[in-house]
From Swiss-Prot:
It comes from Arabidopsis thaliana. This is Sororin-like protein. Residues 167-179 have a biased composition (Basic residues). The keyword Nucleus applies. One of its GO terms (cellular component) is nucleus. Disruption phenotype: Dwarf plants with tissue specific cohesion defects and chromosome mis-segregation associated with sterility (abnormal anthers containing reduced level of viable pollen, and no viable seeds formation in short siliques) as well as premature separation of sister chromatids at anaphase I. Severe alteration of root development with lost characteristic layered cellular organization. Somatic deficiencies, but barely meiotic deficiencies, are alleviated by additional WAPL disruption in the wapl1-1 wapl2 double mutant. It is found in: Nucleus. Residues 192-214 are annotated as: C-terminal Sororin domain. The gene is SORORIN. Residues 24-33, 88-105 have a biased composition (Low complexity). Belongs to the sororin family. The keyword Membrane does not apply. Residues 47-60 have a biased composition (Basic and acidic residues). One of its GO terms (biological process) is microsporogenesis.
Length: 222
């Protein structure tokens, strides 16, 4: 088909009967389906599929019998084409899917593993009771030792006191004889005695000497 000619520098419009640039109805439907397909919707669908597969898994993961069966089982997921109605419903912000509550058995952990702290706690309590009993026994033994030390020290003191006491003699002790010391004659004391005797004799002679008394007569007085 010829290109539209320009008259006076203007591009002529194509006639309405020209359908060269139009697209068929089937192609419009496919393009609309592609147009309404949203990557967020595909991701949400994938999450839903994964959650369903997780729920279908057996509880006991550790068992070796069920593991090959799960591996051999094909996962079939039928994804229908997204229509306009579905795309309109899903165009609104999809609510976040609730996470499945995994039980302890799904995690591969048995209830016995959670009962271990209780047994450890009881062991600790027993150990604390044993420590208390040991402390009480040690305190009683220390008190008994102190009492024994006190009694032994008092016994030692009494023994020492009894040993320090003088033992009574059965035989009477001999009396010591007094010895009279002979006085030695000192030359100084003998000279003093002689001098004293001489002085006594001298004064005795003086006392015995009498002077004669003369009587005066009347004639002499005239």
């Amino acid at each position: 088909m010829e290109a539209p000619r320009s008259v006076g520098g203007r591009i002529q419009r194509k006639p309405l009967a020209d359908c060269t640039n139009t697209v068929s109805r089937s192609s419009q439907q496919s393009s609309s389906s592609v147009k309404f397909a949203n990557p967020s919707l595909t991701s949400s669908l994938k999450r839903l599929v994964e959650q369903t597969t997780l729920k279908e898994k057996p509880k006991d993961v550790n068992t070796s019998a069920t593991a090959p069966e799960i591996a051999s089982r094909p996962i079939t997921t039928d994804v229908r084409p997204v229509t306009r109605r579905m795309s309109a419903d899903l165009a609104s912000p999809a609510s976040a899917p609730s996470r499945p509550q995994t039980s302890r058995s799904d995690m591969g952990v048995s209830d016995k593993d959670f009962t271990e702290p209780w047994s450890v706690y009881t062991v600790r309590r027993k150990a604390s009771g044993q420590k208390r009993s040991k402390d009480a026994s040690s305190s009683t033994s220390a008190a008994a030792r102190i009492r024994l030390d006190l009694s032994s020290s008092s016994g030692k003191k009494t023994r020492q006191a009894s040993e320090n006491k003088k033992k009574t003699l059965k035989v009477a002790p001999k009396k010591r004889q007094r010895t009279v010391k002979q006085e030695k004659e000192d030359p100084v004391s003998a000279a003093c005695q002689d001098y004293i005797e001489k002085q006594k004799a001298y004064f005795a002679e003086i006392d015995a000497f009498e002077l004669p008394v003369e009587e005066v007569s009347n004639s002499d007085s005239d």
